[in-house]
Amino acid sequence: MTIKFPPRSDWRHFNFAERMFLPDLNEVFGGRGIGLYALAFLLLLCGLSVLHTFLVRKSAHHIPGPLLARWTNLWLAYHAYRGRRYKAVHAAHQRYGVMVRIGPNHISVASPEALSVIYGQGPRAPAKSPFYDSFVCNGKPSIFSTRDRQDHSTKRRVVSHAFSSSALQEFIPLIHSTIGDFTQRLDEFCLKGEYFDVLLWFNYLAFDVLSDLAFGERIGMLKQGSDLVEIQRAGESSVHENAIALVDEREHLAAIVGIHPFLQVVVNSLPFLSGNKATSGLEELGRRQLIAARGYDVRSPNADEVAELTAEAVTLLIAGSDTTSNSMAVTLHFIATNPRVYTKLMGLLLEASSGQNEMSYEQAKDVPYLQATINEGLRLHSTTAIGLHRSAPPGGLVCCGHFFPEGTELSVPAWTIGHDTELWGDPDVFRPERWLEGKESRQYLLAFGKGPRACIGQNLAYIEMISVLATILLRYKVEVRSQELQTTEGFMHKPLDCWIKLSRR
């Protein structure tokens, strides 16, 4: 099984980029002289970028990297725009070594030793960098996007009760109920005997589960068989838009503009860009669901509270739906394309379920090989493939023998760590057994981040992935249409699709 990028002309992310920028600019300028406007804009951006380098460059000058990256963040922004940032950074590490300059003030450190330094705890630990400002929703930083430690601690205390062990135990029956809706739709595909894109249905499932948690009621994508949601932006009439496309465009735009401060300023000042429209659409979706489910009134004194809750709800929908749906799709694909793993896992699941074609989460979680298979899928695919940005604290820090002054941007590339031969031995092989061999492998799994800013919802994600994959494998025989999995990257690394055919066991 290989992970393969599609031809450049077919990249879904390139279409995202065109939708985010080019059509809107044509609309604004009436299609006249768009090339000149774009060229002038790029020249101005390059000039400002180089000027910015001279003003803020702080990090060790001797660290090598691509020539353009030494002088401007546009090298990294370009690869993010093309949906191949993690590949470009990985290639740079293969050429230049453990430490690579991927921006004038941004050093990528491909070393396991760097994880505890860059993503560590305590008052001297690096904080999130300005990169995360591009993810701010509704003008209110969420638990994910806030850079302030105290604000993050406050938000985490407020939100953490929803992800506590007791709260998740109460939520498990609701997850199983939603999985029931999911299997009803899969049964329909069984009867047809046709290939279908299960990634879409994983997305619908994730949205329904997370909206139930965030708002107290499901959006209902599984039942309607569509991700169309009603959106009404300020001053506009109500329209129906695809929620998955909104998530993809918003997340991809944020991953690009967060790299460069001038891009953030320019893009934020252009509300007509469809990437910004995607952001406003998600904010409106979260606000409407919140008001409908919880009875909030935006005209009341609680309007600020609604904005705060909307920011958290939108963050939960985006991060949760992307992580779980993509991870379930690639893990199912890895299982189905590795007969040895498929046969071994099925034997263990059938034994644990006493030969039945269904099992509870409580039963499934006690099958260690299932969780090992999920961890291996998370490692090999690397749902979060990029390095998560941090800023060196006041007084600077020492990492891997190098001193970095205050404000230096640092990151550890998740894809490169997940495919490190010294760590894994055979990193390109799908081998779940590595997670059961007694090694401390879990500390190098970066799918949910690392340290005090790691994803607060990762336990919920595991509950969902374990429950869903156990259900599918016990209930159906799975056949994939292609041995290759084509992927793209925004902030998350995701498959373009996952075509399978099911038959009942």
Predicted features, each with a name:
Residues 68, 172, 176, 232, ...:
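Cytochrome P450 I-helix active-site segment
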Residues 184, 191, 218-219, 339-342, ...:
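Cytochrome P450 heme-binding "Cys pocket" and the immediately downstream C-terminal segment
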Residues 157, 314, 319, 360-365, ...:
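Cytochrome P450 heme-thiolate "Cys pocket" and heme-binding signature region
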Residues 127-136, 170-326, 344:
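Cytochrome P450 heme-thiolate monooxygenase catalytic core
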Residues 2-154, 176-185, 205, 278-284, ...:
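N-terminal membrane-proximal hinge/A-helix region immediately C-terminal to the signal-anchor transmembrane segment
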Residues 323-336, 468:
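Short, small-residue alpha-helix embedded
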Residues 393, 398, 412-438:
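Conserved cytochrome P450 K-helix/beta-meander segment immediately N-terminal to the heme-binding cysteine loop
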Residues 60-64, 81-83, 165-169, 361-368, ...:
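Conserved, non-catalytic sequence blocks in retroelement Pol enzymes and Pol-derived host proteins
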